[in-house]
Protein backbone atom coordinates (compact mmCIF):
# COMPACT_ATOMS: atom_id res chain seq x y z
CA UNK A 1 0.00 0.00 0.00
CA UNK A 2 2.96 2.31 -0.50
CA UNK A 3 1.06 3.98 -3.28
CA UNK A 4 -1.43 5.45 -0.84
CA UNK A 5 -0.03 8.73 0.35
CA UNK A 6 -1.18 11.45 2.69
CA UNK A 7 -4.86 11.95 2.86
CA UNK A 8 -5.39 8.81 0.88
CA UNK A 9 -4.14 10.38 -2.35
CA UNK A 10 -1.74 8.64 -4.65
CA UNK A 11 1.86 9.03 -3.57
CA UNK A 12 4.22 10.52 -6.13
CA UNK A 13 7.87 9.60 -6.28
CA UNK A 14 8.87 12.59 -8.36
CA UNK A 15 7.93 14.70 -11.36
CA UNK A 16 8.24 11.81 -13.76
CA UNK A 17 6.18 9.47 -11.63
CA UNK A 18 2.93 11.30 -12.24
CA UNK A 19 3.27 11.36 -15.99
CA UNK A 20 4.54 7.80 -16.26
CA UNK A 21 1.07 6.56 -17.04
CA UNK A 22 1.06 8.67 -20.19
CA UNK A 23 4.05 6.73 -21.49
CA UNK A 24 2.33 3.35 -21.11
CA UNK A 25 0.75 1.65 -24.11
CA UNK A 26 -2.79 2.59 -25.01
CA UNK A 27 -4.23 -0.56 -23.47
CA UNK A 28 -2.65 0.13 -20.08
CA UNK A 29 -3.75 3.76 -20.20
CA UNK A 30 -7.33 2.75 -21.03
CA UNK A 31 -7.36 0.20 -18.21
CA UNK A 32 -6.12 2.82 -15.76
CA UNK A 33 -8.81 5.21 -16.96
CA UNK A 34 -11.47 2.56 -16.39
CA UNK A 35 -10.16 1.92 -12.88
CA UNK A 36 -10.34 5.64 -12.12
CA UNK A 37 -14.00 5.80 -13.09
CA UNK A 38 -14.77 2.59 -11.22
CA UNK A 39 -13.11 4.22 -8.21
CA UNK A 40 -15.31 7.27 -8.69
CA UNK A 41 -18.45 5.13 -8.74
CA UNK A 42 -17.37 3.19 -5.65
CA UNK A 43 -16.58 6.38 -3.73
CA UNK A 44 -19.92 7.96 -4.65
CA UNK A 45 -21.93 4.89 -3.65
CA UNK A 46 -19.96 4.36 -0.43
CA UNK A 47 -20.19 8.01 0.65
CA UNK A 48 -23.92 8.21 0.04
CA UNK A 49 -25.00 4.71 1.04
CA UNK A 50 -23.47 4.85 4.53
CA UNK A 51 -25.39 8.01 5.44
CA UNK A 52 -28.63 6.80 3.88
CA UNK A 53 -28.42 3.33 5.41
CA UNK A 54 -27.80 4.71 8.92
CA UNK A 55 -30.70 7.14 8.52
CA UNK A 56 -32.95 4.38 7.23
CA UNK A 57 -32.02 1.94 10.01
CA UNK A 58 -32.46 4.59 12.73
CA UNK A 59 -35.90 5.69 11.52
CA UNK A 60 -37.47 2.28 10.94
CA UNK A 61 -40.51 1.57 13.14
CA UNK A 62 -40.08 -1.02 15.85
CA UNK A 63 -37.27 -1.79 18.26
CA UNK A 64 -34.24 0.46 17.75
CA UNK A 65 -30.82 -1.16 17.91
CA UNK A 66 -28.10 0.14 20.20
CA UNK A 67 -25.74 2.33 18.17
CA UNK A 68 -22.82 1.50 20.48
CA UNK A 69 -23.09 -2.20 19.57
CA UNK A 70 -23.01 -1.35 15.86
CA UNK A 71 -19.81 0.66 16.40
CA UNK A 72 -18.19 -2.28 18.23
CA UNK A 73 -19.23 -4.78 15.54
CA UNK A 74 -17.84 -2.55 12.79
CA UNK A 75 -14.49 -2.37 14.62
CA UNK A 76 -14.41 -6.15 15.09
CA UNK A 77 -15.13 -6.83 11.41
CA UNK A 78 -12.61 -4.21 10.32
CA UNK A 79 -9.90 -5.73 12.53
CA UNK A 80 -10.62 -9.26 11.30
CA UNK A 81 -10.49 -8.07 7.69
CA UNK A 82 -7.11 -6.42 8.22
CA UNK A 83 -5.86 -9.58 9.94
CA UNK A 84 -6.88 -11.65 6.92
CA UNK A 85 -5.14 -9.21 4.58
CA UNK A 86 -1.94 -9.41 6.62
CA UNK A 87 -2.29 -13.21 6.60
CA UNK A 88 -2.49 -13.10 2.80
CA UNK A 89 0.58 -10.84 2.67
CA UNK A 90 2.48 -13.50 4.63
CA UNK A 91 1.39 -16.05 1.99
CA UNK A 92 -0.75 -17.97 4.44
CA UNK A 93 2.12 -18.71 6.83
CA UNK A 94 0.67 -18.59 10.35
CA UNK A 95 4.08 -18.67 12.03
CA UNK A 96 5.35 -15.68 10.05
CA UNK A 97 2.13 -13.78 10.80
CA UNK A 98 2.36 -14.46 14.55
CA UNK A 99 6.03 -13.43 14.67
CA UNK A 100 5.25 -10.29 12.66
CA UNK A 101 2.35 -9.28 14.93
CA UNK A 102 4.38 -10.03 18.07
CA UNK A 103 7.17 -7.77 16.84
CA UNK A 104 4.92 -4.99 15.47
CA UNK A 105 2.29 -4.90 18.23
CA UNK A 106 3.97 -6.10 21.43
CA UNK A 107 7.72 -5.53 21.06
CA UNK A 108 7.21 -2.10 19.49
CA UNK A 109 4.49 -1.31 22.01
CA UNK A 110 5.19 2.43 22.00
CA UNK A 111 4.20 2.59 18.34
CA UNK A 112 1.06 0.63 19.16
CA UNK A 113 0.14 2.94 22.04
CA UNK A 114 0.33 5.94 19.71
CA UNK A 115 -2.75 4.58 17.95
CA UNK A 116 -4.81 4.76 21.16
CA UNK A 117 -5.46 8.49 20.69
CA UNK A 118 -6.90 8.42 17.15
CA UNK A 119 -8.73 5.18 17.94
CA UNK A 120 -10.48 6.81 20.90
CA UNK A 121 -11.45 9.78 18.74
CA UNK A 122 -12.66 7.60 15.86
CA UNK A 123 -14.81 5.57 18.25
CA UNK A 124 -16.31 8.79 19.61
CA UNK A 125 -16.79 10.08 16.07
CA UNK A 126 -18.64 6.96 14.93
CA UNK A 127 -21.03 7.24 17.87
CA UNK A 128 -21.55 10.94 17.16
CA UNK A 129 -22.45 10.14 13.57
CA UNK A 130 -25.31 7.93 14.74
CA UNK A 131 -26.56 10.71 17.01
CA UNK A 132 -26.30 13.31 14.23
CA UNK A 133 -28.00 11.20 11.54
CA UNK A 134 -30.77 10.24 13.96
CA UNK A 135 -31.58 13.94 14.45
CA UNK A 136 -30.94 15.41 10.99
CA UNK A 137 -32.21 14.59 7.50
CA UNK A 138 -29.66 12.56 5.54
CA UNK A 139 -29.13 15.31 2.94
CA UNK A 140 -28.65 17.97 5.63
CA UNK A 141 -26.16 15.77 7.46
CA UNK A 142 -24.26 15.00 4.24
CA UNK A 143 -23.87 18.70 3.44
CA UNK A 144 -22.99 19.75 7.00
CA UNK A 145 -20.53 16.89 7.41
CA UNK A 146 -18.35 18.44 4.71
CA UNK A 147 -17.11 20.75 7.48
CA UNK A 148 -14.61 17.93 8.07
CA UNK A 149 -12.69 19.35 5.10
CA UNK A 150 -12.40 22.67 6.92
CA UNK A 151 -11.30 21.07 10.21
CA UNK A 152 -8.84 18.76 8.46
CA UNK A 153 -7.31 21.69 6.59
CA UNK A 154 -6.93 23.74 9.77
CA UNK A 155 -5.38 20.86 11.72
CA UNK A 156 -3.06 20.15 8.77
CA UNK A 157 -1.82 23.73 8.88
CA UNK A 158 -1.36 23.64 12.66
CA UNK A 159 0.07 20.13 13.10
CA UNK A 160 1.83 19.41 9.80
CA UNK A 161 2.82 22.97 8.81
CA UNK A 162 1.02 22.46 5.53
CA UNK A 163 0.36 25.50 3.36
CA UNK A 164 -2.89 26.12 1.53
CA UNK A 165 -3.31 28.10 -1.66
CA UNK A 166 -5.45 31.22 -1.77
CA UNK A 167 -8.03 29.31 -3.80
CA UNK A 168 -8.22 26.65 -1.10
CA UNK A 169 -8.70 29.25 1.64
CA UNK A 170 -11.44 30.85 -0.48
CA UNK A 171 -13.08 27.46 -1.02
CA UNK A 172 -13.05 26.82 2.75
CA UNK A 173 -14.84 30.14 3.30
CA UNK A 174 -17.32 29.16 0.59
CA UNK A 175 -17.79 25.79 2.28
CA UNK A 176 -18.52 27.38 5.65
CA UNK A 177 -21.00 29.79 4.04
CA UNK A 178 -22.82 26.96 2.29
CA UNK A 179 -23.10 24.90 5.47
CA UNK A 180 -24.34 27.95 7.40
CA UNK A 181 -27.08 28.51 4.80
CA UNK A 182 -28.17 24.87 4.98
CA UNK A 183 -28.30 25.01 8.77
CA UNK A 184 -30.26 28.28 8.65
CA UNK A 185 -32.74 26.58 6.34
CA UNK A 186 -32.94 23.62 8.72
CA UNK A 187 -33.53 25.86 11.75
CA UNK A 188 -36.15 28.05 10.08
CA UNK A 189 -37.74 25.51 7.75
CA UNK A 190 -41.37 24.79 8.25
CA UNK A 191 -43.13 21.47 8.14
CA UNK A 192 -43.66 18.83 10.79
CA UNK A 193 -40.67 17.11 12.37
CA UNK A 194 -40.66 13.74 14.12
CA UNK A 195 -40.96 14.27 17.86
CA UNK A 196 -37.87 12.18 18.61
CA UNK A 197 -35.59 14.37 16.44
CA UNK A 198 -33.74 17.41 17.73
CA UNK A 199 -31.92 19.43 15.03
CA UNK A 200 -29.88 21.27 17.68
CA UNK A 201 -28.52 18.00 19.05
CA UNK A 202 -27.87 16.81 15.50
CA UNK A 203 -25.92 19.95 14.62
CA UNK A 204 -23.83 19.75 17.80
CA UNK A 205 -23.08 16.08 17.09
CA UNK A 206 -22.05 16.66 13.48
CA UNK A 207 -19.80 19.62 14.40
CA UNK A 208 -18.13 17.56 17.14
CA UNK A 209 -17.77 14.69 14.66
CA UNK A 210 -16.11 17.00 12.12
CA UNK A 211 -13.68 18.34 14.73
CA UNK A 212 -12.76 14.83 15.84
CA UNK A 213 -12.45 13.65 12.24
CA UNK A 214 -10.09 16.49 11.35
CA UNK A 215 -7.83 16.05 14.36
CA UNK A 216 -7.73 12.25 14.29
CA UNK A 217 -7.18 12.16 10.53
CA UNK A 218 -4.19 14.50 10.67
CA UNK A 219 -2.81 12.77 13.77
CA UNK A 220 -3.08 9.38 12.04
CA UNK A 221 -1.40 10.78 8.93
CA UNK A 222 1.46 12.06 11.08
CA UNK A 223 1.87 8.60 12.61
CA UNK A 224 1.89 6.91 9.20
CA UNK A 225 4.47 9.33 7.86
CA UNK A 226 6.70 8.83 10.90
CA UNK A 227 6.73 5.02 10.82
CA UNK A 228 7.18 2.15 8.42
CA UNK A 229 4.10 0.15 9.41
CA UNK A 230 1.72 -0.84 6.63
CA UNK A 231 -1.75 0.64 6.36
CA UNK A 232 -3.32 -2.74 7.17
CA UNK A 233 -1.20 -3.13 10.30
CA UNK A 234 -2.18 0.35 11.48
CA UNK A 235 -5.84 -0.37 10.78
CA UNK A 236 -5.58 -3.63 12.73
CA UNK A 237 -4.09 -1.76 15.69
CA UNK A 238 -6.84 0.84 15.43
CA UNK A 239 -9.40 -1.96 15.30
CA UNK A 240 -8.03 -3.53 18.49
CA UNK A 241 -8.17 -0.25 20.37
CA UNK A 242 -11.50 0.65 18.77
CA UNK A 243 -13.09 -2.60 19.90
CA UNK A 244 -11.84 -2.20 23.48
CA UNK A 245 -12.81 1.47 23.70
CA UNK A 246 -16.14 0.80 22.01
CA UNK A 247 -16.95 -1.83 24.63
CA UNK A 248 -16.09 0.66 27.37
CA UNK A 249 -18.39 3.24 25.78
CA UNK A 250 -21.12 0.64 25.39
CA UNK A 251 -20.90 -0.34 29.06
CA UNK A 252 -20.88 3.30 30.20
CA UNK A 253 -23.73 4.54 27.99
CA UNK A 254 -26.02 1.55 27.52
CA UNK A 255 -24.57 -1.25 29.63
CA UNK A 256 -27.71 -1.96 31.65
CA UNK A 257 -30.01 -1.95 28.61
CA UNK A 258 -27.67 -4.16 26.57
CA UNK A 259 -27.36 -6.62 29.47
CA UNK A 260 -31.15 -6.75 29.80
CA UNK A 261 -32.08 -6.94 26.10
CA UNK A 262 -29.01 -8.47 24.49
CA UNK A 263 -26.11 -7.26 22.36
CA UNK A 264 -27.91 -7.80 19.05
CA UNK A 265 -31.26 -6.41 20.17
CA UNK A 266 -33.05 -4.67 17.29
CA UNK A 267 -30.69 -6.00 14.62
CA UNK A 268 -32.32 -6.36 11.21
CA UNK A 269 -30.84 -6.89 7.73
CA UNK A 270 -30.76 -3.09 7.38
CA UNK A 271 -28.69 -2.79 10.57
CA UNK A 272 -26.26 -5.46 9.40
CA UNK A 273 -25.97 -3.54 6.14
CA UNK A 274 -24.94 -0.45 8.13
CA UNK A 275 -22.37 -2.45 10.11
CA UNK A 276 -20.86 -4.01 6.98
CA UNK A 277 -20.79 -0.67 5.17
CA UNK A 278 -19.07 1.01 8.09
CA UNK A 279 -16.57 -1.83 8.52
CA UNK A 280 -15.63 -2.46 4.91
CA UNK A 281 -16.43 0.91 3.36
CA UNK A 282 -13.32 2.70 4.56
CA UNK A 283 -11.09 -0.28 3.76
CA UNK A 284 -12.59 -0.47 0.29
CA UNK A 285 -11.91 3.22 -0.26
CA UNK A 286 -8.34 2.66 0.93
CA UNK A 287 -7.89 0.23 -1.96
CA UNK A 288 -9.68 2.04 -4.77
CA UNK A 289 -8.35 5.47 -3.86
CA UNK A 290 -5.01 4.29 -5.25
CA UNK A 291 -6.47 4.83 -8.71
CA UNK A 292 -8.28 8.11 -7.96
CA UNK A 293 -6.82 11.58 -7.67
CA UNK A 294 -8.08 14.50 -5.62
CA UNK A 295 -10.29 15.81 -8.42
CA UNK A 296 -12.11 12.50 -8.64
CA UNK A 297 -12.52 12.44 -4.87
CA UNK A 298 -13.97 15.94 -5.04
CA UNK A 299 -16.41 14.82 -7.71
CA UNK A 300 -17.26 11.74 -5.63
CA UNK A 301 -18.15 13.83 -2.59
CA UNK A 302 -20.14 16.30 -4.67
CA UNK A 303 -22.05 13.56 -6.46
CA UNK A 304 -22.71 11.75 -3.19
CA UNK A 305 -24.37 14.91 -1.83
CA UNK A 306 -26.61 15.02 -4.90
CA UNK A 307 -27.32 11.29 -4.63
CA UNK A 308 -28.13 11.57 -0.92
CA UNK A 309 -30.49 14.46 -1.58
CA UNK A 310 -32.32 12.67 -4.40
CA UNK A 311 -32.57 9.47 -2.36
CA UNK A 312 -33.79 11.43 0.68
CA UNK A 313 -36.60 12.89 -1.41
CA UNK A 314 -37.66 9.41 -2.49
CA UNK A 315 -37.09 7.53 0.78
CA UNK A 316 -37.81 10.08 3.50
CA UNK A 317 -39.97 12.72 1.80
CA UNK A 318 -37.23 15.35 2.14
CA UNK A 319 -38.21 18.77 0.76
CA UNK A 320 -35.60 20.79 -1.16
CA UNK A 321 -36.26 24.52 -1.05
CA UNK A 322 -34.21 27.28 -2.76
CA UNK A 323 -32.22 27.99 0.42
CA UNK A 324 -31.08 24.38 0.76
CA UNK A 325 -30.28 24.22 -2.96
CA UNK A 326 -28.15 27.38 -2.66
CA UNK A 327 -26.25 26.12 0.37
CA UNK A 328 -25.70 22.66 -1.10
CA UNK A 329 -24.54 24.21 -4.37
CA UNK A 330 -21.97 26.34 -2.53
CA UNK A 331 -20.70 23.29 -0.66
CA UNK A 332 -20.42 21.22 -3.84
CA UNK A 333 -18.53 24.03 -5.57
CA UNK A 334 -16.25 24.49 -2.57
CA UNK A 335 -15.47 20.77 -2.43
CA UNK A 336 -14.54 20.77 -6.12
CA UNK A 337 -12.39 23.90 -5.87
CA UNK A 338 -10.57 22.65 -2.78
CA UNK A 339 -9.74 19.35 -4.47
CA UNK A 340 -8.14 20.99 -7.51
CA UNK A 341 -4.38 20.35 -7.81
CA UNK A 342 -2.09 23.32 -7.33
CA UNK A 343 -1.32 23.53 -11.03
CA UNK A 344 -4.97 23.94 -11.92
CA UNK A 345 -5.47 26.40 -9.07
CA UNK A 346 -2.63 28.55 -10.40
CA UNK A 347 -4.16 28.39 -13.87
CA UNK A 348 -7.50 29.62 -12.52
CA UNK A 349 -5.78 32.41 -10.62
CA UNK A 350 -3.76 33.49 -13.65
CA UNK A 351 -6.81 33.33 -15.91
CA UNK A 352 -8.71 35.66 -13.60
CA UNK A 353 -5.81 38.15 -13.51
CA UNK A 354 -5.54 40.81 -16.27
CA UNK A 355 -2.85 40.15 -18.87
CA UNK A 356 -0.71 42.93 -20.29
CA UNK A 357 0.69 43.22 -23.77
CA UNK A 358 4.43 42.97 -23.01
CA UNK A 359 3.87 39.67 -21.22
CA UNK A 360 2.67 38.03 -24.44
CA UNK A 361 5.60 36.27 -26.05
CA UNK A 362 5.61 35.62 -29.80
CA UNK A 363 7.72 32.71 -30.99
CA UNK A 364 10.08 33.85 -33.78
CA UNK A 365 9.59 31.93 -37.05
CA UNK A 366 12.00 29.13 -37.75
CA UNK A 367 12.71 28.38 -34.09
CA UNK A 368 11.40 25.26 -32.37
CA UNK A 369 8.66 25.90 -29.85
CA UNK A 370 9.62 25.90 -26.18
CA UNK A 371 9.04 22.67 -24.23
CA UNK A 372 5.46 22.29 -23.07
CA UNK A 373 4.85 22.10 -19.35
CA UNK A 374 1.84 19.87 -19.91
CA UNK A 375 4.10 16.84 -20.31
CA UNK A 376 5.58 17.48 -16.87
CA UNK A 377 3.07 17.10 -14.15
CA UNK A 378 5.25 18.11 -11.27
CA UNK A 379 2.77 20.85 -10.38
CA UNK A 380 0.06 18.31 -9.82
CA UNK A 381 1.01 17.71 -6.20
CA UNK A 382 -2.18 18.04 -4.26
CA UNK A 383 -3.16 18.88 -0.76
CA UNK A 384 -5.02 16.09 0.99
CA UNK A 385 -8.71 16.39 0.26
CA UNK A 386 -10.01 13.69 2.55
CA UNK A 387 -8.61 13.03 5.98
CA UNK A 388 -6.62 9.90 6.62
CA UNK A 389 -9.67 8.61 8.44
CA UNK A 390 -10.96 7.61 5.02
CA UNK A 391 -8.79 4.55 5.54
CA UNK A 392 -10.29 3.57 8.83
CA UNK A 393 -13.88 4.70 8.96
Curated annotation (Swiss-Prot):
SUPFAM superfamilies according to UniProt: Multidrug resistance efflux transporter EmrE (SSF103481)
Keywords linked to the UniProt accession: Antiport, Golgi apparatus, Membrane, Sugar transport, Transmembrane, Transmembrane helix, Transport
Membrane topology field: Multi-pass membrane protein
Catalysis: reaction(s): UMP(out) + UDP-alpha-D-galactose(in) = UMP(in) + UDP-alpha-D-galactose(out); UDP-N-acetyl-alpha-D-galactosamine(in) + UMP(out) = UDP-N-acetyl-alpha-D-galactosamine(out) + UMP(in); UMP(out) + UDP-alpha-D-glucose(in) = UMP(in) + UDP-alpha-D-glucose(out); UMP(out) + UDP-N-acetyl-alpha-D-glucosamine(in) = UMP(in) + UDP-N-acetyl-alpha-D-glucosamine(out)
InterPro entries: Nuc_sug_transpt (IPR007271)
Region of interest (Disordered), residue spans: 353-393
A GO-annotated cellular component: Golgi membrane
Protein name per UniProt: UDP-galactose translocator
Organism, scientific name: Bos taurus
Name of encoding gene: SLC35A2
